[in-house]
Amino acid sequence: GCPWDPWC
């Protein structure tokens, strides 16, 4: 996931 969005 992304640092700002765990669902990326």
From Swiss-Prot:
This is Contryphan-Fic. One of its GO terms (molecular function) is ion channel regulator activity. The keyword Disulfide bond applies. It comes from the Eukaryota. Belongs to the O2 superfamily. Contryphan family. Disulfide bonds join C2-C8. InterPro entries: Contryphan_CS. Signal peptide: none annotated. Its target is unknown, but this toxin may modulate voltage-activated calcium channels (Cav) or calcium-dependent potassium channels (KCa). Its main location: secreted. These peptides are not hydroxylated and not amidated, and no D-amino acid are detected. PROSITE patterns: CONTRYPHAN (PS60027). Keywords: Disulfide bond, Ion channel impairing toxin, Neurotoxin, Secreted, Toxin. Expressed by the venom duct. It is found in: Secreted. GO terms for cellular component: extracellular region. The lineage of its organism: Eukaryota, Metazoa, Spiralia, Lophotrochozoa, Mollusca. The cysteine framework is C-C. It comes from Conus figulinus (Fig cone).
